[in-house]
Amino acid sequence: ALSDPNHRFVPFFGSSEWSRMDAMHPSVLAEAYNRGYTPYLLGQRGAASLTQYFGIQQIIPQMTKKQAVYVISPQWFVKKGANAAAFQSFFSNDQMVSFLRRQRGTSYDQYAAKRFLELYPESSLSQMMEKVAKGQELSKADRGQLKLRQKVLEKEDNFYSQFAVSSRNYDDKIAKKAVSLPKTFSYETLSNRADQLAAKATDNNPFRVSNNFFNTRLKGNYKALKGSQTK
């Protein structure tokens, strides 16, 4: 999609916020105000900075001298770093192959490889990652194996790209909300509109969190959570 000459997609890197398709979602705003691009959403719940870093390795050629938006989530900044289980669930062999083929042994490459091994030491190409982490060059045999894997992965991508994607989600979750926004773009007007929507959606609890979240996750047991994060 990022290489499409007939449509301008801008990658938006983030995590769980992309799944909340409210009226102020960047996809809705782009549709409502004809911004000349379509946000290409990258990331979901549990995705963190290291996940995004390896994901970017796959699209470096398409991103060169192009724009991108990177939304940083506060939950990424935790003492222990990224969650290993979450990282492994989002990581793909294609990302690893792309990284190993593009890396040049820089300090950035070495650090990324070390962090990868901390979170996914049993991966299929961990031996090559260990070489990068130590600043060693990959052998001719290593590069030949990576080239072969890349060809296999490209064939898989070509196969799955044949299947059409329904536009129903776009119509239901984006187009309908875009129509509800003011016709003229204004930060002040949209800010007031966001305040109104937020007040309505968080009016059944003292914490001002989503009514649905409170009803399904907190209402029955929130009193028992008192002091649970003080230690």
Regions found by a protein language model. Give the residues of each.
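N-terminal hydrophobic targeting segments that direct proteins to the cell envelope
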Residues: 1-5
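Catalytic nucleophile-elbow at a beta strand-turn-alpha helix junction centered on a G-D-S/GDSL motif
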Residues: 7-23
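Short loop/turn segments at strand-loop or loop-helix junctions that form parts
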Residues: 14-15, 70-75, 212-219
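Membrane-embedded segments
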Residues: 18-108
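Secreted/periplasmic serine-hydrolase-like ester/acetyl group-modifying domain
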Residues: 99-231
